[in-house]
């Protein structure tokens, strides 16, 4: 047996897992500040949900989904993104009947079959938000501000915000016709994938990173010139709210995102040092998605951020997160009677909120002290038969080397004072 993880997956081990915990805890605090509540959905859904929600002509649905047939003959897919599942839950549980807006956040693994590379895996992790029940452009600005707040708390401020409006289905259809005509006149310059997209979904071509395609796209019609009055005013209002918050942004008329459900506002937060795959956050409005999935017309907006890519950006920037994997106390024991007593003290210390460890390998005092040093223990408590007989233990400050004796009867209270 080849004992290794499947290609495109990654074990997250200490101390790296501490970074993940810090990022997730930071995000949770900010979600709470913005009144977003956690939702947890299954990691697999019926395949039709993603076909209808994401769009059958998207790269995700056509090429990247992990789809299989279960023992009941049902087509099941591991979720490639989070929004469709949250929308399904919102509709299934009739949350739309409650007071709106409804604000959710989620954190969890997603799955896409694509070529593994820096910051991209076949099992990857996202944290994201979804807000339902309001078409207020102020909510669009809030979602963008929330994403920036997370990055700011993590120390990543050297980012750029890009926004666009891809309109409603009516004005987007007019634009799509004009774009298709233009692209057909330059079809010989398009890459193989874009030629295939031309008849299926020409807007996807705007997202192509191929150099020659980018040159063609540069002179293509701009969707902002085709917005209806309502969509134009909505986009102008979004910009005004961003201005009100002092958020700097750039309007990018080629920004369409890779999913079919987006309407009106689309945005990305980019960190240019990541190269071609520089988008950390991505999101936008999806006012037609609830109707596409469940025949209920309810506006929605959200974003997702890839945690692996976020950590890559933090590492590129040299940002050291304030994580701590050290412990407060390591109990060094001499003899079996002392070990039994120390085992109980270890439990009592933990119960009082102190992180504590004890030797489980029967090592010498010297080896136990080395182990205490490796764990980053702030203090060691040395307990042997003589300490039990005298009712006193030796406590050593591992930073200064200072040693003091304390009464075993007061051990917990005294250690609480020290740590």
From Swiss-Prot:
NCBIfam families: hisS
Localization (cell): Cytoplasm
Signal peptide residues on this chain, from the entry's feature table: none
SUPFAM superfamilies tied to this protein: Class II aaRS ABD-related, Class II aaRS and biotin synthetases
Alphabetically ordered keywords of this record: Aminoacyl-tRNA synthetase, ATP-binding, Cytoplasm, Ligase, Nucleotide-binding, Protein biosynthesis
Enzyme Commission number(s): 6.1.1.21
Pfam families for the chain: HGTP_anticodon, tRNA-synt_His
GO biological process, one term: histidyl-tRNA aminoacylation
Principal localisation: cytoplasm
Family that this chain belongs to: Belongs to the class-II aminoacyl-tRNA synthetase family.
Keyword Transcription: no
Substrates-to-products reaction catalysed: tRNA(His) + L-histidine + ATP = L-histidyl-tRNA(His) + AMP + diphosphate + H(+)
GO cellular component: cytoplasm
Enzyme class: ligase
A GO term, aspect molecular function: ATP binding
Protein name, as recorded: Histidine--tRNA ligase
Subunit structure: Homodimer.
Taxonomic placement: Bacteria, Bacillati, Bacillota, Clostridia, Halanaerobiales
Originating species: Halothermothrix orenii (strain H 168 / OCM 544 / DSM 9562)
Primary gene name: hisS
């Amino acid at each position: 047996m080849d004992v290794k993880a499947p290609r495109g997956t990654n074990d997250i081990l200490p101390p790296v897992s501490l970074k993940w915990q810090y990022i997730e805890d930071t995000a949770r605090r900010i979600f709470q500040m913005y009144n977003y509540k956690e939702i947890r959905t299954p990691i697999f859904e019926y395949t039709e949900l993603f076909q209808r929600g994401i769009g059958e002509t998207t790269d995700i649905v056509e090429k990247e989904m992990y789809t299989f047939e279960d023992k009941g003959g049902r087509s099941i897919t591991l979720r490639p993104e989070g929004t469709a599942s949250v929308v399904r839950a919102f509709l299934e549980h009739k949350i739309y009947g409650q007071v709106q807006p409804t604000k959710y956040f989620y954190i969890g693994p997603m799955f896409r079959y694509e070529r593994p590379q820096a910051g991209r895996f076949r099992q990857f992790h996202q944290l994201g938000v979804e807000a339902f029940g309001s078409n207020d452009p102020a909510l669009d600005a809030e979602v963008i501000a929330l994403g920036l707040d997370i990055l700011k708390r993590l120390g990543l401020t050297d980012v750029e915000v890009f926004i666009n409006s891809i309109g409603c289905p009516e004005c987007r259809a007019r634009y799509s016709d004009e774009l298709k005509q233009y692209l057909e006149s330059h079809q010989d310059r398009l890459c193989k994938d874009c030629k295939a997209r031309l008849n299926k979904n020409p807007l996807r071509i705007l997202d192509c990173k191929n150099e020659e395609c980018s040159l063609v796209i540069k002179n293509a019609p701009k969707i902002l010139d085709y917005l209806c009055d309502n969509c134009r005013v909505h986009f102008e209002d979004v910009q005004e709210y961003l201005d009100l918050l002092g958020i700097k942004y750039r309007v990018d008329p080629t920004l369409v995102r890779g999913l079919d459900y987006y309407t009106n506002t689309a945005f990305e937060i980019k960190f240019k040092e990541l190269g071609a795959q520089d988008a950390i956050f991505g999101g936008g409005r999806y006012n037609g998605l609830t109707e596409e999935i469940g025949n209920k017309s309810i506006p929605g907006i959200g974003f997702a951020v890839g945690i692996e890519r976020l950590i890559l950006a933090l590492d590129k920037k040299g940002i050291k997160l304030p994580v701590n994997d050290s412990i407060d106390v390591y109990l060094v024991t001499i003899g079996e009677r002392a070990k039994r007593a120390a085992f109980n003290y270890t439990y009592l210390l933990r119960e009082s909120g102190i992180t504590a460890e004890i030797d489980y390998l029967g090592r010498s005092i010297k080896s136990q002290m080395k182990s205490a040093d490796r764990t980053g223990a702030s203090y060691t408590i040395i307990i042997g038969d003589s300490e039990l007989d005298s009712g006193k233990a030796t406590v050593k400050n591992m930073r200064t080397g200072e040693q003091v004796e304390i009464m075993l009867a007061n051990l917990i209270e005294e250690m609480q004072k020290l740590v």
